[in-house]
Structures are given as structure tokens and as C-alpha cells.
């Protein structure tokens, strides 16, 4: 006996034949999977993390996927989280448009019994809702949109999503986390990097599968007009082709034109590789542009200790907080940062012991200017206390924070960082940002005080104190640098 084929039993057929969207040109049209959506559909796992270029329709696809699963499966609950209420409402409009335009015969079979501004509840017991959090729900499907932005601007909300919303989804149900990159820190970065390293054939139901969708796979990202390329973009294309990515002239022209408006954000908004996506300037970041240049010029590498040149230290001394110490040498006009350490809960005596235990020949030790302040308990300044223990601090000049940040920006072009021994410092400088103002939805002018502040402060003291520690004269013939040595090549 032959059973008649019913296309409504085919999830892929339903996705491409029942639902309408408003496309990027503002026209209502029947939804059809593009290459990225099809690749995600064919390769999706229980837990999925998606790093992508802009305008590939990933959020739209996941919204329609969840709507379809709720319509054709009873007692399913789907939740969609966006980083702002306005964005959540926009995602819900896509779902509502798709539901309102399915064939009447289908909608009559599965009517919406509750149709509000943020939730659809269907007669089969399934529901789909949107918001900025899903704590307290029990979900079968969860989509977190632009999680990178949430991590960058709303770290408390990101933590709540991790501990609350993600825990509403049982193993074996479905999670989709997608975003463009927002710097080398935060939960989105950590989830992506861990998932990227995982063998895809050895994943458990709790492991995330990594998906990456670059700009150059999108067939519409090309122009027919020939445009001139700046030299740096030509060099970039050569680098891509050297790594096996082949792009044609029309794609190159599109990229060059797009880069004119996106500028430093191009690698974030339209990455070619997953590694590249993390290199773009972070919104609100003070030093990401300068640190990216350090990487491009290979100034984050092996930086050896030169025992013919003295070592200086720059400190951020916390009273009830972390202490950070940077060890650096001045070699010609280069600043070689050979080591950086940080910790909390230890006394000044402990840190002096750590510094003395290093095999370095020291010259000057820079500390914050408030090291001269006297403590009520002892009547002594911490400069006096350190001197009694055998280490003489020099207070840094009294410079306001923002001019000090400008000093760091101007000095970073001279800096070389040891890749292993200063990894924490490099990460801090790449992720040191302004504070986000939730009420005004903009960046404040002041820095965010978080785990990256201590190294960033120590670096600021280093840079504003160079006039104290730099040699009064320097002879490039006798003091070279890594640019002219085998280590810097």
C-alpha cells in the first residue's frame, strides 16, 4: 500500500513554502533558504553558536524555524532573546508577519489563542515569545540574538542569560546563539573559541557546534563597477589568497567600497575568517585599533630579556583590589614588555618578594602618584613602607585619566609584547572599554572598572612616566631593537 505524500509532514518543504518575510528591499516575499541558512539547517546541532557576517538572514531563519516547530508540534515552548526591547519587538514582527500570512487552511487548524505584542500561544499548546530574558521559563527552543553585543554592553545581562535563560533548556532541546564578534572577551567569545576547537563528530548534547559564515560566500556581495583599491586592501586580498580564499574582481570591488564606510569595523561586520572577526575595533574600546596594529606588525611575539639593559616596572597598587605589575625594557626607541603579572588578596610585602625573585637587573619602579599618601594605621606612606623593604618607588606624574589614555595610544606603536608572559596584559588592553550608559544608550567618557582595569592602569602609569625612565640620550647604533633583530622578523 502506497501512502500519499503530504508536504506538510516535510519540515524543509514547510519552511520554504508556508512562510513570508519582508526582504532586504522592503518587499513581502515567500521565504526561501539562502546558502547560509541552508548550511545551518543541514548542519545544526542541539546547541549551536554562530559567528557571521552581516545581513545573511540567520535571525530570520531561526525565527521561522521556531514558529514552524511550534505550529506542527504540540506543547513546544520557544523563546527568543534580543539585546534590547526594541530589537526583540522587531524579531517578533517577523514571526507575526510569517504567521499572519500562512495559508488559511493551516491557520484554521492551529489558531493562535493568545496574540500579544510579544507572545503567540497556539491551540496545540505550543507558544513562542520574545524578550530580553527568559528566566523562569521552560523552553524547548532558545535563540539568543547578537549575544556578542549583550556581552560587550550589558555584562550583567549576559551573566543572567548564561545562568538563567540557558538553564531553562534541557539537554536534547535546541539552542541557537548568534552574533557578530565584539572583541576577545566575554561569554560569546569563550563559547565560540571552545566550540571551534571541538571535533564535530564527538559532541554531546550539551556541547556547542560552531558555525561560521563569511562575507565572501554571499553571492550578492559583489559589484560590477571597477574601483581602485588602496594598497592596504590589495595587501589584505593577497593575504586571503595566500591562505586559500579565492575571491574575484567583483567581490574585491564590493569589499573595497564597503570598507570606505565601515572602516575599522570591516573585520567585525564582514569577516573573511573566524580569527579575523575578533580583530576588529570593539565598540567603546580605547586601544583595540592600536593593539590590532601590534598584531598585524607581529609585535606580539617572543620578546627576550636583554641582560645588558635594565628592567623597569610599572605598578597598579590596589588597596583592597588587584595589583598589576608590568616589567619592561627600553631598547632604542622600542619598549619591550617582557612580562606582566597580576593578582589579588596579597600584601605589598608579597609583591615586593615576587619582584625581587625575578632574574632581572632593575632600574626604576613606577607607582601611582597616591603612593605618597599616608595610611592612618601606620602613619607611613606605602612609598616609605616599600623603601624599608628595599624597593624605592617613583610616583608617576599626576595626569588625569583621559590624557593618560591618549598617552597610551601614542606609545603603543613603540611597544613589543612577549606573547606568553604578557598574555593577560594584551587581553586587558584589547578589551579596556568605556562605561556603557543604559539610560542614555551611549558610551560614557569614563572607563569601565572591571577585570581589565588593573593592567590598563599600570600601562597608563608606564606611558605617562616615560620621561622619568627613558635615557636622556640614545644612540640607535648601540641600542637596536626587535625590528632589526631575528626575533622581530
Residue spans of the language-model regions?
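Gly/Thr-rich phosphate-binding beta-strand-loop-beta motif of the actin/hexokinase/Hsp70
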Residues: 306-330
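Mg2+-dependent endonuclease catalytic cores in nucleic-acid-processing enzymes, primarily RNase H-like
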Residues: 48, 91, 96, 184-203, ...
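Inter-Walker segment of RecA-like/P-loop motor cores
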Residues: 90-141
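Conserved Walker A/P-loop ATP-binding site and its immediately adjacent core
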Residues: 76-97
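ASCE P-loop NTPase helicase motor core
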Residues: 109, 149-249
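Walker A/P-loop
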Residues: 45-66
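ATPase catalytic-site recognition across NTP-hydrolyzing enzymes
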Residues: 219-315
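Pre-P-loop entry segment of helicase/translocase ATPase cores
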Residues: 1-47
Amino acid at each position: 500500500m502506497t501512502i500519499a505524500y503530504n508536504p506538510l509532514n516535510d519540515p524543509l518543504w514547510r519552511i520554504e513554502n508556508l512562510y513570508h518575510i519582508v526582504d532586504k528591499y522592503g518587499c513581502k516575499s515567500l521565504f526561501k533558504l539562502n546558502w547560509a541558512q541552508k548550511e545551518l539547517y543541514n548542519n545544526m546541532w542541539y546547541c549551536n553558536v554562530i559567528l557571521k557576517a552581516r545581513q545573511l538572514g540567520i535571525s530570520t531563519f531561526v525565527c521561522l524555524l521556531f514558529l514552524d516547530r511550534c505550529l506542527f508540534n504540540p506543547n513546544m515552548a520557544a523563546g527568543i532573546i534580543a539585546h534590547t526591547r526594541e530589537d526583540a519587538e522587531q524579531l517578533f514582527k517577523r514571526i507575526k508577519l510569517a504567521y499572519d500570512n500562512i495559508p488559511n487552511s493551516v491557520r484554521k487548524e492551529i489558531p493562535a489563542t493568545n496574540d500579544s505584542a510579544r507572545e503567540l500561544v497556539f491551540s496545540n499548546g505550543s507558544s513562542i515569545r520574545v524578550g530580553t530574558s527568559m528566566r523562569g521559563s521552560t523552553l524547548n527552543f532558545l535563540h539568543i540574538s547578537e549575544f556578542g553585543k549583550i556581552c560587550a554592553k550589558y555584562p550583567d545581562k549576559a551573566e543572567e542569560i548564561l545562568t538563567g535563560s540557558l538553564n531553562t533548556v534541557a539537554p536534547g532541546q535546541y539552542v541557537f546563539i548568534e552574533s557578530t564578534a565584539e572583541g576577545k572577551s566575554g561569554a560569546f567569545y569563550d563559547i565560540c573559541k571552545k566550540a571551534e576547537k571541538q571535533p564535530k563528530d564527538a559532541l554531546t548534547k550539551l556541547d556547542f557546534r560552531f558555525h561560521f559564515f563569511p562575507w565572501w560566500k554571499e553571492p550578492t556581495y559583489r559589484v560590477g563597477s571597477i574601483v581602485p583599491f588602496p594598497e592596504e586592501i590589495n595587501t589584505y586580498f593577497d593575504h586571503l589568497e595566500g591562505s586559500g580564499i579565492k575571491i574575484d574582481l567583483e567581490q574585491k570591488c564590493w569589499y573595497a567600497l564597503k570598507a570606505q564606510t565601515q572602516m575599522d569595523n570591516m573585520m567585525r561586520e564582514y569577516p573573511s575568517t573566524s580569527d579575523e572577526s575578533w580583530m576588529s575595533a570593539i565598540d567603546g574600546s580605547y586601544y583595540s585599533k592600536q593593539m590590532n596594529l601590534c598584531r598585524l606588525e607581529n609585535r606580539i611575539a617572543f620578546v627576550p630579556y636583554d641582560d645588558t639593559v635594565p628592567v623597569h616596572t610599572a605598578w597598579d597598587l590596589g588597596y583592597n583590589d588587584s595589583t598589576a605589575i608590568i616589567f619592561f625594557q627600553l631598547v632604542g626607541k622600542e619598549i619591550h614588555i617582557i612580562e606582566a603579572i597580576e593578582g589579588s588578596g596579597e600584601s605589598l610585602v608579597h609583591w615586593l618578594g615576587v619582584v625581587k625573585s625575578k632574574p632581572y637587573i632593575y632600574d626604576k619602579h613606577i607607582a601611582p602618584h597616591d603612593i605618597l599618601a599616608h595610611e592612618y594605621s601606620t602613619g607611613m606612606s606605602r612609598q616609605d613602607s616599600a623603601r624599608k623593604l628595599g624597593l624605592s618607588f617613583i610616583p608617576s606624574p599626576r595626569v588625569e585619566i583621559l590624557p593618560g589614555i591618549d598617552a597610551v595610544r601614542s606609545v603603543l606603536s613603540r611597544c613589543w609584547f612577549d606573547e606568553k608572559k604578557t598574555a593577560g596584559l594584551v587581553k586587558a588592553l584589547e578589551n579596556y572599554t568605556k562605561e556603557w550608559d543604559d539610560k542614555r544608550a551611549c558610551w560614557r567618557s569614563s572607563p569601565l572598572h572591571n577585570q581589565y582595569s588593573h593592567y590598563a592602569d599600570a600601562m597608563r602609569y608606564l606611558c605617562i612616566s616615560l620621561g622619568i625612565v627613558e635615557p636622556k640620550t640614545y644612540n640607535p647604533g648601540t641600542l637596536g631593537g626587535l625590528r632589526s633583530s631575528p626575533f622581530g622578523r
